From Swiss-Prot:
The gene is mys-1. PROSITE patterns: MYST_HAT. SMART domains: CHROMO (SM00298). It comes from Caenorhabditis elegans. It comes from the Eukaryota. This is Histone acetyltransferase Tip60 homolog. Acetyl-CoA binds at residues 311-313, 318-324, 348, 357.
Length: 458
């Protein structure tokens, strides 16, 4: 294929290539599946991107929805044609994706729909100076529906049926207003089409009902009697609270919560049957009520021992330590249940960072505490798992990721260098100043859902 001609001028002062506008008809060749360099607005540099969709504006120009290669899909965006580097365009291979259907830009039409365990083995804790290991620095969701219209009825969030349907790869909501915050969503969420065609969706921060205008929101707030999430307040400390919400008893709230979360989670499938799930909503309290900052959900009965199905901190409240707080709370519940738990996989990139950070700190604290309580004694991975409620596989993977798990003279040992010990002791001390879960403020007892069902059947 002959590449389209493009005139380039060298800037005399900076030597930067400038592109002279090309014939608009040349952009007709750029179809779904094409890869080319695109000027990324957030970084002001060209990056390789794949064209997901395109549409024609009323003035006849074409704009393209692109996914930047090797970047998270929350960075996907609509771009004008002048940000494309046509000289770099690579057409999709034969047998690949079909070309995109060009649509007329209409806020009430299809464009917006598209935007639419082994044996217990004692592991010796070697003296800090016996062996040296390299220093390792530890780290800090509902993808698409199975179809573009009607989701299956299974559970609120699930990995089943993760789809790459082009329509659901396109962010279909431009903006939401939740409380005092206006937020740009990251991913597709199946809100009603008549709302996704609007510039902004307005959401009540207490009941999470979605409305089409500021006026409708004001009218709703005059009637809405809620000033906190439904369900039971099971934790309250330092103006932070957790509310436990049964997905069967509070279906409307649970479904609205899942829709809201889908805007910011990409690795799970959204379903409308919330009955099998419990939701734990974290709130900040002020004179007006309890304002949602994040949540996690879990299955009432999980054969895989998952203690978290989905977890999310809303963007305005990120980087405040709330992610670690949600994770810590989920493990406090597991400790009361006397079970080990693990989050449902896969985790988002941000979720994985948060979990690795929590696991690292929790495991290191337990190792140091064990060393003080039982000097000279050995510890097993199972011991660590039971004391922290972190599943055995996650304990092992964390020790390996920190380069602490070594094979030595026929058995596995945990090796902590003086350097690492000092680093983690400082981090543990610094963590004491951060917001933490106070177990004494947690008023909760686990429910045996399986036993109740068995009694009813009997």
């Amino acid at each position: 294929m002959t590449e389209p001609k493009k005139e380039i001028i060298e800037d005399e002062n900076h030597g930067i290539s400038k592109k002279i506008p090309t014939d608009p008809r040349q952009y007709e060749k750029v179809t779904e599946g094409c890869r080319l360099l695109v000027m990324m607005a957030s970084q002001e540099e060209e990056r390789w991107a794949e064209v997901i969709s395109r549409c024609r504006a009323a003035n006849g120009s074409i704009k393209f929805y692109v996914h930047y290669i090797d970047c998270n899909r929350r960075l996907d965006e609509w771009v004008q044609s002048d940000r494309l580097n046509l000289a770099s365009c690579e057409l999709p291979k034969k047998g690949g994706k079909k070309g995109a259907h060009l649509r007329e830009e209409n806020r009430d039409s299809n464009e917006n729909e598209g935007k639419k365990s082994g044996r217990k083995r004692k592991i010796p804790l070697l003296p800090m100076d016996d062996l040296k290991a390299e220093s390792v620095d530890p780290l800090q969701a509902i993808s698409t529906m199975t179809s573009g219209s009607t989701p299956s009825l299974r559970g609120s969030m699930s990995m089943v049926g993760h789809s790459e349907d082009a329509m659901t790869r396109i962010r279909n909501v431009e903006c939401i207003e939740l409380g005092r915050s206006r937020i740009q969503p990251w991913y597709f969420a199946p809100y009603p089409q008549q709302l996704t065609s609007l510039d902004c969706i307005y959401i009540c921060e207490f009941c999470l009902k979605y409305l089409k205008s500021k006026t409708c929101l004001k009218r709703h707030m005059e009637k809405c009697a809620m000033c906190h999430p439904p369900g039971n307040q099971i934790y309250s400390h330092d103006k932070l609270s957790f509310f436990e919400i049964d997905g069967r008893k509070n279906k409307s709230y649970a479904q609205n919560l899942c829709l809201l979360a889908k805007l910011f989670l990409d690795h799970k499938t959204l379903y409308y049957d919330t009955d099998p799930f419990l939701f734990y909503v974290l709130t900040e309290e002020d004179e007006k009520g309890h304002h949602i900052v994040g949540y996690f959900s879990k299955e009432k009965e999980s054969a895989e021992e998952y203690n978290v199905a989905c977890i999310l901190v809303l963007p305005p409240f990120q980087k405040k330590g709330y992610g670690s707080l949600l994770i810590e709370f989920s493990y406090e519940l597991s400790k009361i249940e006397q079970k080990t738990g693990s989050p449902e996989k896969p985790l988002s990139d941000l979720g994985l960072l948060s979990y690795r950070s929590y696991w690292s700190m929790a495991i290191m604290k337990e190792l140091f505490a064990f060393k003080r309580r039982h000097p000279g004694e050995d510890i097993t991975v199972q011991d660590i798992s039971q004391s922290t409620s972190i599943k055995r596989e996650d304990v092992v993977s964390t020790l390996q990721q920190l380069d602490l798990y070594k094979y030595y003279k026929g058995s596995y040992i945990i090796v902590i260098s003086d350097e690492k010990r000092q680093v983690y002791e400082k981090r543990i001390e610094a963590a004491k100043k951060k917001t933490r879960i106070n177990p004494a403020a947690l008023q909760w007892r686990p429910k045996e859902y399986g036993k109740k069902r068995a009694q009813i059947m009997f």
